[in-house]
């Protein structure tokens, strides 16, 4: 019985009777292609909408190449199969795709109400035909595609977009083209009510955020592929406490311009926007090459004003654009933040995926490691809101208010706007606000630069670094030395002393001026003597540095850590190392990406790190109950450890490095190895995954089940040992009192027999 579509029996037949041949793709898509060659030209009704049909064709793209309206637009031909090929390449639309798709046929959506039994000939495909307005693109042409895994896709030919219809054939037989956005642009389906199988709740609002959050686990490539398919969709963030408080998100690409309420599916508009950007860049290049100094100076002045004080144009950006009819400059705002985000998250390691409907100037950014950032384009501030996208969906808008905003703006003294009379006062006020906020949240001093001296050194509150830093490693080293201690606790490589001397020598002239601002010009004799001593020490250190040959040779110039060489103030660096802009202040990465405290592995030969007390001569210790150490009369009361007081301290206190020191047994007396610890200074944060316990951010909130507390084999949490001075002396034998709190628990504070150690 031939499979034909009849008008009277279309609604009563099961879709499986028409599309059973799709199940052949489970074995090989070659079997599906063989069926298409045998049934070429057959029209099958779709599962939904039932009034539309699928025209089976083994090579539908070869048929579409007849029309010049498609061949004249090369951007629409991306991924199309070649003449001798059958497969459609989805990588231009789906970057993480690893297999090609097999075209099944063509779907022409009707522009007006027409009967399914009415034949549609190829001769009727012209602009004068009122039934199909395909030339304007209002009635899309769709190509149905199948993947080797059974997934079905739909390619919009005129818009150049690829949609994922379903992940299996059985799901396609139930939903049809419901997940294809192109069908709702057809004139027939714009005012038509939704079918009965359609859920009353918007599927994008309910299912899309969960799907995006799960896809973000696999990285930015997989997230980008799904995010591009659903541009323009809306979703909501619920509040964990106030259920009626909901924050709406719109998936859009903020790098291309201001967000629109409709679907951003038109590749023509994207091509126009990119060409406009290219024309603007070419025009600016021609102006600079032609010698138009006035236009160049005016453009530089506007750019400097926008970089220096972005808060001055907030009112005009928010409310004045709609009234004056100006074009929004969200792309310009993002172009200003792009180099800062590249330096902070790495080039290609961040993606702005959505913006808030209530606050369009706030956009959400997903980074490579999974943390979600929020960027405010009005005041150019950035803050971390969640560790991953799943946590953001669970806690909702509550996380948008947490965290400390870090301003991404250049310091004072950059550009021509610094010469304005009110600019220094405004920047000084902003600098004081930032310094007070940083000092209130962290014990360290602010590290924002205050000025550049004649010798290329940047004057800061406590940490010196070069105005043209030699490399990123040295800049991170300065931050690490500042976090590891005060002025007397520098790095162990001796580099901090040379830097300190060079800083005192370079800032010898600016120190009296800065001290005069704070002390109203009053300086005592002792202060002058200290300045003289500091200058002598600086000259001695600098002379020893130059004679000792501590500089690094790079080419013909000698580069030292003090910032001096054959070229004077400019330090010579290898050409392969890029020199960052010294005027732009970027917050250190450990402020936005704090890593948790590393897990502590238990010691193999001693499961418990607590020192034990030897038992008394007349009393044998129990084998089942734990024996906590008893207080000795000489030891203070506060130094005695208790089982209830043993807990892991918070990461904001300090880190402790453990090392085992075995006591050598001289004669027949049995001596056990007692663990000792040595507190190590805080290591400087690494640029990839830094960790700063003194970060001004709140401790990161992580979703349950991601990282559990470290546990030892005995079932008790890992605890820090007490100080060596707090342990009772081993010379005295104190009788141990067995505790009956947990009789079934294993022994705590007692070394296990050799059999248990080997097991």
Curated annotation (Swiss-Prot):
Transmembrane segments: none annotated. Residues 269-328, 406-759 are annotated as: Disordered. Coiled coil: none annotated. It comes from the Viruses. The gene is DR1. Residues 289-299, 417-430, 469-518, 525-545 have a biased composition (Basic and acidic residues). Residues 585-599, 681-690 have a biased composition (Pro residues). The lineage of its organism: Viruses, Duplodnaviria, Heunggongvirae, Peploviricota, Herviviricetes. This is Uncharacterized protein DR1. Residues 406-415, 431-444, 659-680, 691-704, 728-746 have a biased composition (Low complexity).
């Amino acid at each position: 019985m031939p499979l034909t579509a009849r008008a009277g029996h279309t609604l009563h037949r099961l879709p499986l009777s028409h599309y059973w041949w799709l199940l052949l793709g489970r074995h090989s898509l070659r079997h599906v292609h063989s069926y298409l060659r045998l049934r070429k030209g057959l029209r099958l009704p779709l599962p939904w909408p039932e009034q539309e049909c699928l025209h089976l064709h083994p090579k539908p793209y070869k048929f579409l190449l007849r029309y010049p309206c498609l061949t004249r637009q090369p951007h629409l031909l991306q991924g199309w199969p070649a003449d001798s090929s059958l497969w459609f390449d989805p990588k231009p639309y789906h970057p993480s795709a690893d297999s090609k798709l097999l075209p099944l046929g063509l779907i022409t959506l009707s522009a007006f109400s027409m009967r399914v039994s009415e034949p549609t000939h190829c001769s009727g495909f012209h602009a004068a035909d009122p039934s199909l307005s395909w030339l304007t693109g209002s009635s899309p042409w769709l190509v149905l595609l199948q993947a080797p895994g059974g997934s079905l896709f739909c390619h919009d030919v005129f818009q150049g977009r690829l949609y994922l219809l379903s992940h299996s054939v059985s799901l396609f037989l139930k939903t049809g083209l419901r997940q294809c956005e192109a069908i709702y642009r057809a004139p027939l389906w714009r005012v038509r009510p939704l079918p009965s199988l359609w859920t009353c709740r918007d599927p994008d609002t309910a299912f899309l955020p969960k799907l995006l959050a799960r896809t973000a686990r696999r990285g930015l490539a997989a997230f980008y592929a799904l995010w591009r398919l659903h541009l323009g969709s809306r979703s909501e963030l619920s509040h964990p406490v106030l259920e009626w408080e909901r924050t709406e998100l719109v998936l859009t690409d903020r790098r291309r311009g201001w967000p629109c309420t409709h679907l951003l599916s038109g590749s023509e508009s994207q091509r126009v926007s990119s060409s406009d950007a290219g024309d603007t860049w070419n025009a600016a290049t021609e102006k600079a090459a032609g010698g138009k100094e006035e236009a160049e100076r005016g453009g530089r002045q506007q750019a400097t004003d926008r970089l220096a004080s972005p808060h001055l144009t907030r009112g005009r950006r928010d409310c004045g654009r709609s009234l004056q009819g100006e074009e929004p400059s969200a792309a310009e705002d993002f172009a200003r933040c792009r180099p800062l985000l590249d330096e902070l998250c790495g080039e290609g390691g961040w993606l702005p995926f959505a913006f808030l409907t209530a606050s369009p100037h706030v956009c959400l950014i997903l980074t490579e490691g999974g943390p979600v950032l929020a960027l405010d384009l009005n005041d150019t501030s950035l803050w971390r809101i969640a560790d991953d996208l799943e946590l953001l969906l669970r806690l909702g808008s509550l996380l948008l208010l947490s965290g400390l905003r870090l301003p991404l703006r250049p310091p004072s003294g950059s550009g021509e706007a610094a010469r304005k009379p009110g600019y220094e006062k405004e920047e000084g006020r902003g600098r004081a606000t930032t310094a007070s906020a940083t000092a209130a949240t962290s014990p360290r001093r602010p590290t924002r630069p205050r000025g550049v001296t004649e010798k290329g050194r940047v004057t800061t509150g406590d940490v010196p670094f070069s105005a043209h830093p030699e490399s990123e490693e040295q800049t991170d080293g300065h931050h690490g030395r500042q976090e590891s201690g005060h002025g007397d606790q520098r790095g162990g490589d001796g580099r901090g002393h040379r830097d300190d001397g060079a800083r005192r020598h370079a800032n010898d002239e600016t120190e009296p001026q800065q001290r005069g601002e704070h002390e109203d010009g009053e300086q005592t004799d002792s202060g002058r003597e200290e300045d003289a001593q500091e200058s002598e020490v600086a000259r001695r250190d600098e002379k020893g540095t130059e004679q000792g040959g501590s500089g690094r040779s790079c080419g013909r110039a000698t580069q030292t850590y003090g910032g001096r060489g054959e070229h004077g103030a400019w330090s010579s660096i290898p050409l392969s190392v890029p020199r960052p802009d010294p005027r732009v202040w970027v917050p250190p990465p450990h402020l936005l990406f704090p890593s948790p405290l590393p897990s502590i592995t238990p010691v193999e030969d001693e499961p418990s790190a607590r020192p034990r007390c030897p038992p008394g001569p007349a009393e044998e210790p129990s084998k089942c109950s734990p024996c906590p150490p008893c207080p000795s009369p000489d030891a203070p009361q506060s130094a005695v450890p208790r089982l209830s007081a043993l807990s892991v301290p918070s990461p904001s206190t300090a880190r402790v490095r453990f090392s085992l020191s075995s006591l050598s047994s001289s004669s027949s007396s049995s001596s056990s190895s007692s663990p000792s610890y040595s507190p190590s200074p805080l290591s400087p944060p690494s640029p990839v995954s830094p960790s700063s316990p003194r970060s001004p951010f709140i401790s990161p909130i992580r979703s349950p089940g991601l990282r559990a507390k470290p546990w030892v084999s005995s079932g008790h949490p890992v605890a820090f040992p007490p100080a060596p001075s707090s342990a009772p002396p081993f010379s005295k034998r104190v009788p141990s009192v067995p505790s009956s709190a947990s009789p079934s628990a294993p022994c705590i504070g007692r070394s296990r027999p050799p059999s248990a150690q080997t097991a």
